[in-house]
Amino acid sequence: MEKIYVIYWSMSGNTQAMAEAIAKGINDSGKEAEVQYVSEASVSELQDAKVFALGCPAMGAEVLEEGEMEPFVSEVEGIAAGKKIALFGSYGWGDGQWMRDWEERMSGCGAAIINGAGLICHETPDDAMISECENLGKQIAAE
């Protein structure tokens, strides 16, 4: 069975909880989710993937985490054309600008953003947000 990759970076565990809920939605749909922390992931694994998910919280002045996730996303830009990508992440301040920038960046590389926008969560995901994440996983599995 083809794996659907859910790759994320998390500091506080909020984005990790979102990744795990997205994976549950994928698995509940009869597909196989492969959840990986970004340091364990390889862009080559995504080369042949039609669909995958990337997650990262807002950092600093509403940017992606710069040590591991930013370099990974820069590599993904080279293979993004024609892919369907779900974006997700949590934030503690600001208004989600980091996600809008990320959506624009991936779209600019030729990727289609699932739902047309990333899924963002303010602080810790509550039950309603976990349910939204599971639903996103089901949408990813249906692509």
PLM feature spans:
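FMN-binding flavodoxin-like domain, especially the glycine-rich phosphate-binding loop
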Residues: 2-4, 14-17, 21-38, 48-143
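Short polar catalytic/cofactor-binding loops
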Residues: 9-13
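N-terminal helical hairpins
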Residues: 42
